[in-house]
Amino acid sequence: MNRKKHQILKILLLCLISSKSSASEKELNLQFIRHKFGQNTEDIELFFNSSTVLPGNYTVDVKLNDEVIGRAKLEVSQDDKESYCLKDEWLSDLGIIINRDFYNKYFNIKRECYEIGKEKNSITTFDNNSQIFSLYMPQAAYIKKGNTEHKWSYGDPGFNLNYDAYLSKNDEDSSIYGNLEGNVNIDKWVLYGRGYKYEHDKFTTDDVTLSRAIKSLEGDLIIGDTYTNTSLMDNISFYGVQLRSNNAMTPERRGDYSPIISGIAKSNARVTVKQNGVVLHSELVSPGPFHINNVRGIRSGELVMTVTEEDGSEQQTRIPVTFIANLLSPGNYNYDFGIGNKEATWEPDNIFAYGSFDYGLNLLTLNASLLFEQHYSNAGIGAVGSIGSLGAVSVSGNISRAKNQLETDQGYSTSANYSKNVGANGNLQIIGYKFSSEGYTQYANFDYRAPRKDKKEKERYEVTLTQQFPASNVFLSVTGWKKFYWNDNSVTGANVSYTQNFGTVNASVNGSYSRGDGAKSDYMLGFNINIPFRHNDRQFYSNSGVTYNRNSGIGFNAGFSEDVTKNFNYNVNAAASKDNESVSLSTNYTSSMFRTSASVSKNRNSTNASAQIGGAIIGVKDGGVMLTSMSSNSVAIVQMEGLAGYAFTNGVESDWRGRIAYPMTTYMDNDIQISTDKLPSNIELTDNVETIVPTNRAIKLQKIKYKNMSRHVLKVYDKNGFVIPMGTAVKNSNGEIISFVNNNGISLLNIDKNDERVFFGSCTISTSGLKDNLSEIQEVNCE
């Protein structure tokens, strides 16, 4: 329909609607509208959309702030003309826990439900043609369910194998390197391992473990190559059996430090938080500012937050993190028990056993540990206490007895740490001191066959300060330490980092200093600046810097990069120092099945080239084997069988079997949500949102049920040749209301292709002869 005709029809309709005769007195005559509307389906919906909602039971898709969250039965009564009244249980079943104080004045005592739409910032609407019920609620009005509401998912039997292969070549030789890491899941058990191979070496494996999460103990049973996790002794890796608590398993015991991560989303976006390449958290946020304060599993280091918008564009923010003292809430505890050997043998003389337990009291956390073997023993006690606004203090003491082939050493070690959160911006100060007597021996350094005297630590001082200035977009971090050894040697080190953003420009200064064992001091100072810019409607990023090192002198580097597409980018870089000059080009490409990169560089002495390919191979029972470029600790295979090439979730197109790999955060709610706007118009979801709480390294096959629909615009006549009256309910073969008759017998229908008949009141029509067409009104007779 062209614009001129469209405007004329709108004017005619306005004239008819504004007449004094109401719809009940005189039915609107639409005979002047031609039966053929061209190809614009919006014209049909514009003319025939009706806001009339009759009392009854409806099966509806429910949207919360424009995101489909599920499908539910909606009961509409005569009292719902002004505002829909929603029961607490109905909302809870959809994963919404409303703030009762927020909606307290809108609670209908007689009907025992909330008239949410009467609150000025909330809206409830029901489109009876599309069968969509929409809720618009501010963030302060509701919360999402915690993972205690959902059962753990150990996943399905399957495997997840991550691989990387690397080839490099220069003027003289070439080398090949391969790396594998993965797990095989059977029932509730996970067999995990990783291995690598250099060109001429044998394939080497390490970190091979068999583990199981035990919910009743809120911990993990681990068999194989693992590591101790105690608060009073230096942690060591060992081969054996271990049972240890896992704070990630229950919200009330998650004592890990979690910074507040803030940002602004331009659209409905996915926020992903990673550390060291591992996905710690991923969730969808609405447009506007967001705050995330429940990221778990963080360690000291740097977080990378990526905001992926609906159009596929991304923005990254790097967030430095340092731990504060570990205080447990009253009644909470951590434990770690194990038996094994520091080497991959089970010789009785070398087997050790250990235990560690932390327990939270009011304002105090107590720590205790014990380790013993035939030639070594260690015991420790400690406490972490809050001193209110002044911060937190921890003190501990250990004693050891170490017997080697020559003599027996006995000694003690004491430590004290102070930490304080300064201000509301996550600023942190940590001061630490540790003293060890000459006879004290850490088990990590103990060897019965080869006693060591030269590197026994005597004293250690540490200080860390991190400071944020949000108004100036400044982050400052200073760390310093000094160690003294009993052989009169010492080691000193310090790091300084200063970062500031000037709009989209990022500048940083980094410095380090070290000196130890009589060697000359070494220091480094560097300055780096990143500037994004546009040229010919293309987005580029420049990066340049200068460094000074005592040994190598001054060095310069400059480069730029471009994201040509969301899957492909390249980087050009040049560098110069007193000993060398070089230039390099690198490219990166990521598909739904793999990721690959290639680079070439040239310096004074040689030319180098390299290539890399990586990804994951995932197999799951009843879901087959698939290739993906995504790497994740826990993963869901989301499948809409028969729908290949559609990016219905995670922004990645489905493979030939309609599958997409979806990263999940361990022991947290993961809402597997389908983007219906990415699907063909004839697809209607039976279930949209599935919440999964995966265990560590779980592989879950999630099949999404859907109906293949046909869409029609019908003008229906009864047995006597009259059009079906306006307001007549249209039902499918299951008796569910799917639409209503509009003016002049016109109905807009979405019909399951498996439905053979549709009912208009007391008469019925066969669907076999209907055309799947929204651009033409079909006239049919009702039987």
Curated annotation (Swiss-Prot):
Statement: the UniProt record of this protein carries the keyword Protein biosynthesis: no
Pfam families: PapC_N, Usher
BP terms from Gene Ontology: pilus assembly
Topology relative to the membrane: Multi-pass membrane protein
PROSITE patterns: FIMBRIAL_USHER
Disulfide bond sites: 763-782
Database matches in SUPFAM superfamilies: FimD N-terminal domain-like
GO molecular function: fimbrial usher porin activity
Key words of the record: Cell outer membrane, Disulfide bond, Fimbrium biogenesis, Membrane, Plasmid, Signal, Transmembrane, Transmembrane beta strand, Transport
Annotated localization: Cell outer membrane
Gene3D superfamilies in the record: 2.60.40.3110, 3.10.20.410, Outer membrane usher protein FimD, plug domain
UniProt main location, coarse: membrane
Signal peptide annotation: 1-23
GO CC list: cell outer membrane
InterPro entries the record matches: Fimb_usher, Fimbrial_membr_usher_CS, FimD_plug_dom, PapC_N, PapC_N_sf
Function field: Involved in the export and assembly of K99 fimbrial subunits across the outer membrane.
PANTHER family: FIMBRIAL USHER DOMAIN-CONTAINING PROTEIN YDET-RELATED, OUTER MEMBRANE USHER PROTEIN
Family: Belongs to the fimbrial export usher family.
Protein name: Outer membrane usher protein FanD
Gene symbol of the encoding locus: fanD
